[in-house]
A protein has these predicted regions:
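Bacterial N-terminal signal peptides
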Residues: 10-20
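Short sequence/structural segments immediately N-terminal
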Residues: 2-6, 21-159
């Protein structure tokens, strides 16, 4: 192998490692993070904090329990470093659903979940309630997964 070819191969390999590092750097998930979206102009409650590492390691939650595709199919095979869309990218309306007025038809589940806050609440609260029931059944003690506004939104309502 010529010296030029050798230098080219080594340079290509080194550059590939740098490119991989740059691509993966922005896709690692933090251990905990606030469930915030810049799309919200105003908030009624302080942002909830997700303890991602705790959910995965302690509670053994798999990816598909929270993450799903556009058809609601669980994404169970997410790998570390993969880009994952934020909820707001599909659940595009940055608010809770409007209060139903007398005579108006009830929203379908699909229509309701277009509202970002409704989709998040469905995802988190349903799972937390199931978890708490399981703990109660197995131990006789109340489960600690939060299901009320003030437990998930520290400080509660924004004044």
């Amino acid at each position: 192998m010529s010296k030029k070819t050798f230098i080219f191969v080594v340079t290509t390999v080194v550059m590939s490692f740098f490119a991989a590092a740059v691509l993966l750097a922005g896709t690692t998930v933090q251990d905990t993070f606030k469930m915030e979206s810049k799309e919200y102009k105003t908030r009624k409650y302080n942002s909830a904090t997700l303890t991602h590492k705790k959910h995965v390691e302690e509670y053994k939650a798999n990816c598909g329990e929270c993450h799903h595709d556009a058809n609601g199919k669980p994404l169970n095979d997410i790998k570390t470093g993969e880009n994952v869309q934020k909820c707001i990218e599909c659940h595009k309306i940055p608010s809770r659903k409007p209060k139903k007025k007398k005579g108006e038809p009830k929203l379908t589940d699909e229509q309701r979940r277009a509202y970002h806050a409704e989709a998040l609440h469905d995802n988190c609260k349903v799972c937390h309630k199931v978890f708490n029931k399981k703990v109660k059944k197995e131990t006789g003690k109340k489960g600690k997964a939060p299901t009320s506004c003030n437990k998930c939104h520290p400080g509660g309502k924004i004044k």
